[in-house]
Amino acid sequence: LQGFNDEVLDLDHETFARECAIDVPGPETDALGALARQWDAFVMGQAKARHPEFPGRFFNVGFVLSPEGEVILRHHKVVPLLPVEHSVTPHNVWDRWIELYGRNLDAFYPVADTEIGRLGFLMANEGSYPENARGLAMNGAEVVYRGPYPHPHVGNGLFEVQNRARALDNNFYLIACNVGTYYLHTDSDVPIDTFGGGSAVIDYRGQIVGRHDYSAGSSWVAGTIDIEALRKFRASAQWDNWIKDLTTEQYQLIYEQPIYPKNLYLDRAPYTHAEYRREVIDRQIELMHERDVWRRPDKG
């Protein structure tokens, strides 16, 4: 709802949390809830929002509004747009988060069970990591909101590849909703577009059933979502309903060693862009080289 000024302009986290972040529920979701009631529809969206247990901080929160206008799901983004997004994630405050919500799928990949299907969130950069989509699927998701993704990875096709792969791998519908143009400052005269369209509805076999490539402004996309067809496919396919065949004991070996540091912002505000590169990115790349996961490039 607030755009991306905090990311683009490298704004101070605590100032943004105090002056720009919202509460969910709050006046903004109340206004959207009125539209949900008017049109007897579910509304899915996201906003930079505060959390009562983490004063001075904000998260990127996905929310579902019911046709009655009530907030029935809140999802706290688990991977920000690294390295520029300042939103805190559950992993950034891991110890306190699991103390509050437990160490289970609902704490990180919540799903709303509704009359139109089980709804979940795969917001923006979350979709860059297959594990996040799988977490939703393992918690029962059937229709997944994929939030906005910027250039260059819309124009070069990466956004579509990710979206179709996540839907195919997990046999769920994916609604990829990119953003239109926006104004970077309150006094801006000309809107900018750093995203580039690519909104789509993708079915549980990875096929596009509706797509809107580009409009240089606000627009819409539509497609049929057949939940019963999805459920029948999952229940009757012999091969490509993949999740039934997961050899989980084997896959656990991949993740035995920690990689990204947990509790990064448990006791401090998120880094600025320059700090993040120095304190996190450079160290993470070195870690991959030290473990011989990646081979170092030749010098010169």
Give the residues covered by each predicted segment:
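C-terminal beta-strand edge segments of enzyme domains
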Residues: 178-300
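Short, conserved active-site loops that position catalytic residues or coordinate cofactors/metal ions
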Residues: 1-20, 146
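CN hydrolase (nitrilase-like) catalytic-core segments centered on the catalytic cysteine
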Residues: 20-44, 118, 124-222
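Short beta->alpha transition motifs characteristic of CBS
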Residues: 2-3, 63, 74-81, 200, ...
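Glycine-rich loops and low-complexity Gly/Arg-rich segments
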Residues: 19-21, 68-71, 88-90, 98-101, ...
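Recurrent small/Gly-Pro-centered beta-turn motifs in extracellular repeat architectures
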Residues: 47-48
